């Protein structure tokens, strides 16, 4: 099979965390939420009309997008959703990182970034953290084809201040800067506050951590309308039906239960402290 692309031959795939079949295990390998989903999610699932599963889901995920719009105070046209934030991020790599210049991300960070870069033939550069495992904003003032980093970073757990994020964004106006906020609800401010003045900023979040829905695979991106329209265009070019109907309804229900979300997130923060 010599026709296989070289980048596919050499790619080293991300290794997902094991899901043990035995009970009574304290499982820490994938940072799953120890608390169950919101009771409102359980109610939606228990009362789901299974006859609707014969139909394809809403490709626009309207119920979920509209609830995200209310929750975060943004226009629905500023929202893109996918099958977990990994799906959203992979679509971002395909859509925005198309330059012959390297994409920049920390050398100690989420290990999927270089996997996607290798798979999609995207040049990249791992930027070293400083001696205290912090991201040095000055290191991102160089020629690049895009920037991505988690905030807080994983696995260090160290977060950048919003002023530092804005410094990176403003210094790279010709590049898309993606802030991966998988753990943002456990200890730092969201870069969503910076969207109004920064059209090259994209913020990605997930329902897997703070909303206890890792098993349903729901992620989303929020950014300026033009960037979001490009994400939908790429997505609909190869798979128009991503989120299933149950995930869309359950995700919307989780967003409506703000009290439960805040309580469980604070419980986890207090446990860590």
Q: Residue spans of the language-model regions?
A:
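Short beta->alpha connector loops at strand-helix junctions that form conserved
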Residues: 107, 126-130, 205
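Active-site phosphate-binding strand-loop segment of PLP-dependent enzymes
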Residues: 125, 130-185
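PLP-dependent aminotransferase class I/II
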Residues: 200-273
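Short, conserved active-site loop motifs that form the nucleotide-linked donor/cofactor pocket
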Residues: 79, 175, 200-201
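Phosphate-binding glycine-rich loop
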Residues: 62-102
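Conserved PLP-anchoring active-site segment centered on the Schiff-base-forming lysine
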Residues: 95-116
């Amino acid at each position: 099979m010599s026709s296989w692309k070289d980048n596919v031959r050499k790619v080293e795939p991300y290794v997902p965390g094991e899901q043990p079949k035995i009970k009574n295990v304290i499982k820490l390998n994938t940072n799953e939420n120890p608390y169950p989903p919101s009771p409102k999610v359980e109610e939606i699932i228990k009362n789901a009309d299974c006859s609707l599963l014969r139909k394809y889901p809403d490709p626009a995920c309207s119920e979920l997008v509209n609830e995200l719009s209310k929750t975060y105070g943004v226009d629905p046209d500023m929202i893109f959703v996918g099958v977990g934030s990994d799906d959203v991020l992979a679509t971002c790599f395909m859509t925005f990182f198309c330059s012959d210049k390297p994409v920049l991300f920390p050398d100690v960070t989420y290990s999927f970034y270089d996997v996607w870069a290798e798979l999609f033939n995207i040049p990249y550069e791992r930027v070293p953290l400083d001696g205290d495992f912090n991201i040095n904003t000055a290191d991102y003032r160089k020629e690049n084809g895009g920037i991505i980093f988690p905030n807080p970073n994983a696995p260090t757990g160290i977060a950048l201040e919003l002023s530092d994020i804005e410094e990176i964004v403003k210094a790279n106006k010709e590049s898309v800067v993606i802030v991966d906020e998988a753990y943002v609800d456990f200890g730092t401010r969201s870069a969503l506050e910076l969207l109004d003045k920064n059209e090259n900023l994209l913020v990605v979040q997930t329902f897997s951590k703070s909303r206890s829905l890792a098993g349903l695979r729901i992620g989303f991106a929020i950014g300026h309308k033009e960037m979001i329209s490009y994400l939908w265009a790429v997505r609909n070019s190869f798979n128009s039906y991503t989120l299933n109907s149950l995930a869309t309804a359950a995700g919307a229900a989780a967003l409506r239960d703000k009290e439960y979300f805040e309580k469980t997130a604070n419980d986890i923060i207090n446990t860590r402290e």
